[in-house]
Amino acid sequence: FSEVLLLGALGGKRLEHTLSNLCTGLGLEERGVRATLQNERSRITFVMPGETRRYPKEDYFYFSAFPMEGRAEGVCEQGSYYELTDAELTAGYPLGVSNEYAEGSDCITVSTREGALVIVETVAD
């Protein structure tokens, strides 16, 4: 198989299980399997080093990018309210949190040169 959709992998009463499921998603991506974790409010995917992915707006409003391995370099986001160009994201400074689609944009494009990203898309409140 080339894609996996994990339902029931987010939320719940045990945060450590959610974190473990994020790690599982990264492990699948490292093996060439496209991983998506989804619940009723959020969808989580990954952008691997050297990869560019497009995120159509659909029903999502908020868009966040976090370095899954502690640091990501050469991060670019286009089509977002706060665009990034050759940025460095670190776990200690969450620069990529709570972004939005730019006015008139129906897609955000994300790439990373080094370090995997976890992408969180969330519906508006």
Annotate each language-model stretch with its function.
Residues 42, 47-125:
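Long, charged alpha-helical interface segments
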